Amino acid sequence: MSDFDRVRDYLTALQDRICNVVETIDGQSHFHEDHWQRTEGGGGRTRLLRDGAVFEQAGIGFSDVCGTHLPPSASVRRPELAGANWRACGVSLVFHPKNPFVPTTHLNVRYFRAERDGKQVAAWFGGGFDLTPFYPFDEDVVHWHTVARDLCAPFGDERYAAHKRWCDEYFVLRHRNETRGVGGLFFDDLDKDFERDFAYQRAVGDGFLDAYFPIVTRRHDTPYGDRERAFQLYRRGRYVEFNLLFDRGTLFGLQSGGRAESILISLPPLVRWEYGYHPLPGSAEARLADYLLPRDWLNESRICE
């Protein structure tokens, strides 16, 4: 079996595992699966769960696509690959829970290969996961980062710090001067050792289940009202802004002729913007600002709910 097929098999199995956990936790709705083909080459399967008891929308897609010309979002970073044939596979998800006390989350794990004249000229792994709470709990954030740190440990003492920092620097709404959430892990261009890098990708994918779903289970029955719902919809607007303005995966997908319905599945089903909104000082909504900047979560002394 080729290296590419090994990665592909892992990713399709990961999609299945995550979907099974989501359906079990939700207990009400099920994923609808949409198989699609891309005219330029390749295809995928997009799965969407909507209007569940726990998840307002949960979208998770697998894609295996190929082409003969890299889109600008990729070739600008790798000009030496202009004109090369390429193939990429990945799993990407964004979950928008119903309860405002359950954070939105994102995971992406991917593998990219480029060839010229029948010979591989580049191949690398990328991905990561991040968490976007609206009403954050320190306990949840510390759990999230503890799982991230522990899965990084077998890959070197600096891996967690480096990929946490990369996440903090990547998921930033520069026009708002705030991070998208409380971070996690982000990596790209991982190409030193296939077996080691593939093992890390698997650790990230597997670790996501351990990092996210205990938080969902802990918070999805928390009582909330119209005020919390309105704030959740307002903050979802920031998620839309980041994905459409800055996200590399979104730009790559759209510029490469990808399937728009699958690419934009990351966007929430309901969202609102409000001109000049400022939360009341001292409110739970105002408290969120303290979390939307890089912090050393695992070494801070203040740990509370």
UniProtKB/Swiss-Prot annotation:
The active site is at H106 (proton donor). The record marks H175 as: Important for dimerization. It is an enzyme of class 1 (oxidoreductase). It is found in: Cytoplasm. GO terms for cellular component: cytoplasm. It comes from the Bacteria. The keyword Metal-binding applies. A divalent metal cation binds at H96, H106, H145, H175. Pathway: Porphyrin-containing compound metabolism; protoporphyrin-IX biosynthesis; protoporphyrinogen-IX from coproporphyrinogen-III (O2 route): step 1/1. Keywords: Cytoplasm, Heme biosynthesis, Metal-binding, Oxidoreductase, Porphyrin biosynthesis. Involved in the heme biosynthesis. Catalyzes the aerobic oxidative decarboxylation of propionate groups of rings A and B of coproporphyrinogen-III to yield the vinyl groups in protoporphyrinogen-IX. This is Oxygen-dependent coproporphyrinogen-III oxidase. It comes from Xylella fastidiosa (strain 9a5c). The lineage of its organism: Bacteria, Pseudomonadati, Pseudomonadota, Gammaproteobacteria, Lysobacterales.
